[in-house]
Amino acid sequence: RGELIGVKSNKFFSDKPHGMVLIPSGSFTMGPSNPSVVLDQNPTLKTVSVKAFYMDETEITNSEYRQFVNWVRDSVVRNELAVAAYYKIGEETKEDDPLWDFMPVYNRAGDGEEKTAYQEYLEENGLGILDIENKSTYRLNWDVKIPWDRSDYLDANYAAVIEGGIGPDLLEDYEGFFIPADSTPNALRAFKTKRIKYNYRKFDSKNNKWSEYEEIEIYPDTTVWYKDFSYSYNEPMHNDYFWHDAYSEYPVVGVSWEQAKAFAHWRTFYKNQHQRKARKNIQLVSDYRLPTETEWEYAARGGLERAEYPWGGPYTYDDKGCFLANFKPERGDYIADQILYTAEAESYWPNDYGLYNMSGNVSEWTDSNYEKGANDFVAGLNPNIEGSEDNKFKVVRGGSWKDVAHFLKVSTRDYEKKDIKRSYIGFRTVQSYLGEDVGFQENPNKIF
């Protein structure tokens, strides 16, 4: 009737992501409860307000990060098979060719399926292939399985792409994806982890433009178990920690800040890809990302103002003398808390928000740049220091299995270069809560 009624839209309900808990909006006093001029990097106290967000209840585990690695590995292999198929088949359509299914085609019609006008247009202009040199313009076929067993190889051309060498119908010598058997221990078949690279780009909101594509090797550095400890026997951890099922639920380590950012980007892409396939016009999820330093401290406190540790008290043990976190209680004594290295990600009691190991186990990357005395100049609303690309140091929080109790305090700041990988640094991700979290109880995730 000529009234202003707004654009019709669906009612939006924020679904809690799997494995995450809601951290409600609130304010708190950021900084140490008992400032020490000698030890504290940020002795100034500052009251700040934080918008609600979801946070992983545990650190990202080896099992979860392996899902990322396997997806990237498969995409790299599919891409190489797609390129091989493109240049081998060219304009001659040979649907009976073993490599045909790996052709990068956008919405190719199946057998007996009536083509849409758009599919006809795509096929008329190059079989739906857009630009084989530009990965952003074509899609890989994820419906076809990759035969890994050598007895199941499709043909000699497929074998050449996977193992390396020249195929009978291929135009180039392929590098292959496996290390030669004579170069591996016990002639084991080992994938070339250097080839597992994730390509993505970010939107620069300050300059209002997309960044160039970044290519990042995402396999964890297992040699950190050697590098971090001189004259120390840690070979079993180097050999088994990331891939063995015994450590599946342990926090991933040996991951740089850049790799953690790539994981968060992939997690967003992976979820939204599922959302698009589920049904049309579905809302895409907010980006997964690393927490800011302020978000991390706010979540670690669990709603307890002025607490030194996530459990609230000033001590690292309970009334029975049991330690409340995985850390190094005494000089040279890593086992006093009954755990030598890392513990399972869901170990010890969670804090009042339901978050595990916000102190100890592994230190955690945050998104924030490190600046000494940051509390003196950051904003009071969702404070964060993004800084410039020249700042290579990122804030690390929480302390780890090899740290003394001081680093376990929720206010203690530490830092590391963003491209450095350590056997004691992991990460967890967050997702911004859309809308206001009104109507929730004070601690909606409290479990005891």
Cite the ranges covered by each PLM segment.
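Bacterial Sec-dependent N-terminal signal peptides
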Residues: 1-5, 11, 17-18, 263, ...
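A short glycine-rich, aromatic-capped structural motif
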Residues: 13-89, 93-262, 268, 360
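Functional-site microenvironments in short loops/helix caps that host divalent-cation chemistry
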Residues: 22-23, 29, 34, 147, ...
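Generic recognition of flexible, low-complexity loop/linker segments
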Residues: 9, 352, 415-417
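Short, structured beta-strand segments at or near domain termini in extracellular proteins/domains
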Residues: 423-439
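Glycine/tyrosine- and acidic-biased, solvent-exposed loop/turn segments at the edges of beta-strands
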Residues: 10-11, 448
